């Protein structure tokens, strides 16, 4: 048995009767384990699994079986922080090794806003974070097992853990067939163009920008194979990977956008706004990049987003650091302007208060923030749910990382609803904005292998 060296740690654990769960922190260096094998082995746990991989691979975490969840119908930072504290207080955490580096985390986030959601989002709460029974840190090759003390068999626990890890290692990958697309259609395309036209007419010196999203519906001949999607999601390394099962629904995102992360007292975020198509010809690509870096409209849009984000985090920080000129972010299908921003946080800063303040950024909502958010609630077709919403990892301390759920889709049994949006400003053309959203559908169409060739130059400078 590969974990034999951990037996002494198991034998020396003294159970704390005041704690409801025992969480074991276990090394798995000796096991050859990846995302596909984990999802294959735990195929019967559908509806209670997630995978969160950050863009720079700081996190690559898979969670299986939500053993405990914290949720609320409204996002109130203080109450959410209290719920997190109460959940972690239920846990007796024990390390089966001296050199373990990972930290137990919860996965989840909030919906885009508190607007009453339509039926397709019924599986998700307004605020929700999950503690899984099995949590695999594939970056550090470590695993956490959380088990209710009423279900513990300490004598056979090490053998059970080794059996699961060995079973994952030898799991035979199945469900290799791609989903067969039955139909593909835009939802209310003409109405959406009229909505854009109406928004342009409503914009003024006070109401400067609003981001409007639309949807595309894909139906399949049979149920979409989740393991096939996991394989496809592994193909693109320059974005976040978010795969979130809850009940009968699965939310998937390949977003390029970090909302923010905290490590110790340092907050890191990015202002991302301004985009242009990436093409196959290298010379044309250079023209595209040069255009984006010098285009006044894109630079203005980027500057507005950056200034808004900086303004949001100033109350929580003791100092800020960022460059005045944006850099170029290269993704598989598109280029973005982005500015990295770092802040040293005040000692009493709280990740949920920061989340409440910074979301939604102007890149996914508009300006001014509250006016744009209200306009979206009142006029946009359907509800956003987890689209453009914050999703990520939180720890017992305030360390965390949140991404923005862009380039995304919601999958049910035989259909997928894709989401994309664009920023509407004075002078926006409805037809051009409609075509712009086609570019942003491409990552999810590619995951489903239902690709489109309708790629073109961005006109709105918005990363949604």
Label every PLM stretch briefly:
Residues 1-75:
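An N-terminal JmjN-like helical accessory module and its immediate linker preceding a catalytic domain
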Residues 1-5, 140-168, 261-332, 412-464:
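Cytosolic ligand/metal-binding cores
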Residues 2-3, 85-217, 318, 453-455, ...:
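Non-catalytic accessory segments adjacent to catalytic cores
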Residues 50, 107-108, 241-245, 384-392:
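A short glycine-rich, hydrophobically flanked beta-strand micro-motif that places a catalytic Asp/Glu
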Residues 62-66, 217-300, 320, 359, ...:
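An anion-binding catalytic pocket shared by soluble metabolic enzymes
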Residues 108, 136, 205, 260, ...:
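A residue-level signal for conserved active-site and pocket-lining positions in enzyme catalytic cores
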Residues 173-258, 302-305, 309, 316, ...:
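Active-site pocket-lining segments that scaffold enzyme catalytic pockets across diverse folds
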Residues 341-464:
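Conserved hydrophobic core element of enzyme catalytic domains
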